């Protein structure tokens, strides 16, 4: 699903699965678009060379109040489940982000480019993995199994659970890199 130019995608149920793209394997939001996830599944999608195996928000807005983002992969990028780059605003207040992986940073969620993420409610960020890239270029990798925050990103968490995540390098649960 590609959302741009102030369009809004509301997902109340159903499934987005088995898709592959360079970036934003399941959902890619850019240029002021928005995505509201309140039910359904985003699962088993892949970003083959960029960020956001399940969801990529690049200059857009994201709200998650329910549903799940599971078993997605950023094969050569960041944010296996969700990648937030220059997101205007993002809030997660329900649902689960589980069993995602990235061969970069942020197995579950990557927050970068000054993006702001608020986590509240009964959110579960569980069993996500950040692996080391094989090519080992200058960018960090293997950090922030559950959540990676870098490049001016900000996360505020008032409730939720981050558990049983893995990072090959550092920050199994969360890595805050500035």
Label for each model-derived stretch:
Residues 11, 36-37, 41-43, 64, ...:
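Exposed, low-complexity/repetitive linear segments and helix-based recognition motifs
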Residues 124:
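Conserved acid/base catalytic micro-environments in cytosolic active-site loops
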Residues 1-2, 20-30, 46-57, 73-86, ...:
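Extracellular beta-strand/beta-solenoid scaffold signature
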Residues 6-7, 14, 25, 33, ...:
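The right-handed parallel beta-helix/beta-solenoid scaffold, focusing on the short coil/turn
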